Swiss-Prot record:
Family classification: Belongs to the transaldolase family. Type 3B subfamily.
Record GO biological process: carbohydrate metabolic process; pentose-phosphate shunt
Active-site residues (renumbered): 83
Annotated compartments: Cytoplasm
Name of protein: Probable transaldolase
Length: 214
């Protein structure tokens, strides 16, 4: 299972990369805007840190504009993956980019059939948003299960990125299902590392060691 970090914050990316647990990065317009930096420069900086896929989202909604923007984004670095919204024009763009050898990540996927269409169009990745489905009383992980089954049935190479992860349980459930990738906020990565019994154990070992030194 691969872990991506869901952030555009350079410090968070550096810390997670140095720990050795992440394989890529996902960003979106909101995350980039939050950093208050020029987006292209920021994406270049991220690509210099992480030796893996870095998703950058096209904000245009019309096919011609989306395609043009996507091609420009792809020129930033060879690791850039173009994030495309799950719309009709988005699918057309994915199809064209796929034909040009440009990797894509279809985002805002909320149904198995949307994921199926994205895979048919040639998407490299699809991103089902589990947390947002949970927010409206739908079990988001059921969506991931359904997508996995469909992709296995038909031998699609498209990888599933479990997105909108809110807590460590989402990561555990994604791993149990066998999802290809989980994209995780830095705050949740820190939660995954820590456990109260680990802290208690370390404290006890240190106390016992200090007694020995006396």
């Amino acid at each position: 299972m691969k872990f991506f970090i869901d952030t555009a914050n350079v410090d968070e990316i550096k810390k997670a990369w140095e720990v050795g647990v992440i394989d890529g990065v996902t960003t979106n317009p909101s995350l980039l805007a939050k950093e208050g930096k020029e987006p292209v420069s920021l994406l270049k900086e991220i690509c210099q840190i992480v030796d893996g896929p870095v998703s950058a989202e096209a904000v245009s909604l019309k096919y011609e504009d989306m395609l043009k923007e996507s091609i420009e984004l792809s020129k930033i670095h060879s690791n850039i993956v173009i994030k495309i919204p799950m719309t009709e024009d988005g699918l057309k763009t994915v199809r064209k980019l796929s034909q040009e050898g440009i990797k894509t990540n279809v985002t805002l996927v909320f149904s198995p059939t949307q994921a199926l269409l994205a895979a048919k169009a040639g998407a490299t990745y699809v991103s089902p948003f589990v947390g947002r489905l949970d927010d409206i009383s739908h079990f988001g992980m059921e969506l991931v299960r359904d997508i996995q089954i469909i992709f296995e049935n038909y031998g699609f190479d498209t990888e599933v990125i479990v997105a909108s992860i809110r807590n460590p349980l989402h990561v555990l459930e994604a791993a149990r299902i066998g999802a290809d990738i989980a994209t995780i906020p830095y705050s949740v990565i820190k939660q995954l590392i820590k456990h109260p019994l680990t802290d208690i154990g370390i404290e006890r070992f240190l106390k016992d060691w200090e007694k020995l030194k006396k």
